[in-house]
Amino acid sequence: MRPVTLFTGQWADLSIETLCQQAVEFGYDGLELACWGDHFEVDQATEDYCQAKRELLAKHNLALFSISNHLIGQAVCDAIDSRHQAILPPRIFGDGDPEGVRQRAAAEMIATGQAAARLGVDVVNGFTGSSIWHLLYSFPPVSPDMIEAGFADFAARWKPILDQYQALGVKFALEVHPTEIAFDIASAERAIHALDGHPAFGFNYDPSHLGYQGVDYVEFIYRFSDRIFHVHMRDVGWSATPTEAGVFGGHTEFGDRRRYWDFRSLGRGNIDFEEIIRALNRINYQGPLSVEWEDSGMDRVHGATEAAAFVKQVDFPPSDIAFDAAFED
């Protein structure tokens, strides 16, 4: 059975020592370390630092398969504004000059790959940002050249990062998500094409942001079977009837009952995890199933505990025989 891990990004208010203790109590087999809080600090990731992290997890019998640096990755391609100051450390945001922020973020993503190699993991999950997300809705009219320029900008900024990852034996797994260069199947295909199929680029598969958009989240697994480097298990619910705030959210906050969609604890939303597991089996995905737990209406300790149990219950190994072969005996 695949290991069930907990993504620590939503738990950065807790020390890594405390979270290790709790993750064991919740029922997890390992952690996916976020590169914020004290969970994994890229700028401090010397050999000794990485060894101490490995020893801490080993003390709690927790495995480690990946690290995640979504916040820094977001700044590599984004049009930088005051929002980024809230998610970036001062050494990356600096004076806020947009190109300077993007360059420092790119250098930090290279450093993240180097730190991952020292830590002994071969996957870095994260975001890419996008210079063209604001062009999502084609009015005022958006020309094809404007979109092409956005993908070209993405490739120019990320190819040097990915070249470094390839040399290190590390892969970058983009979490396909609104505000990124890829947010559905069509844009994911275009991102791969823009990178000339770079072998170090793939996906941290997360069905939640695909489902409420109306994207075939099971087909995503088959379409990119050789580029599913990591899997996030996250559920989302969306309404079967019209709501006051639609897919775009109506500038409401998560948890607002007027919303069309919202994150749910695993097993309590609309995502069909049965079909996801079957698809992962068919492509022979052997990596971790990492819970990214979000549900604004539920206590997180309760939710993270039930999520670990849910994933272990829904996962199953593929068959190694044809069930009807016995009919021939």
Role assignments for model-derived ranges:
Residues 17-24, 44-65, 108-123, 216-229, ...:
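Short amphipathic alpha-helices and their capping/turn segments at secondary-structure boundaries
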Residues 300-320, 327:
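C-terminal helical cap(s) of enzyme catalytic domains, especially alpha/beta-barrels
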Residues 2-8, 31-33, 64-69, 124-126, ...:
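Hydrophobic faces of well-ordered beta-strands that scaffold small-molecule active sites
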Residues 30, 67, 148-270, 316-327:
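Acidic/histidine-rich catalytic cores of soluble enzymes
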Residues 23, 31, 57, 67, ...:
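Conserved, mostly hydrophobic/aromatic
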Residues 10-12, 35-37, 70-73, 128-132, ...:
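Active-site-proximal loop/turn and secondary-structure-junction residues that shape catalytic pockets
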Residues 13, 17-18, 22, 59, ...:
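Active-site acidic/histidine proton-transfer and metal-coordination neighborhood
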Residues 34-54, 131-135:
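Glycine-rich, proline-tolerant flexible connector loops at the mouths of alpha/beta enzymes
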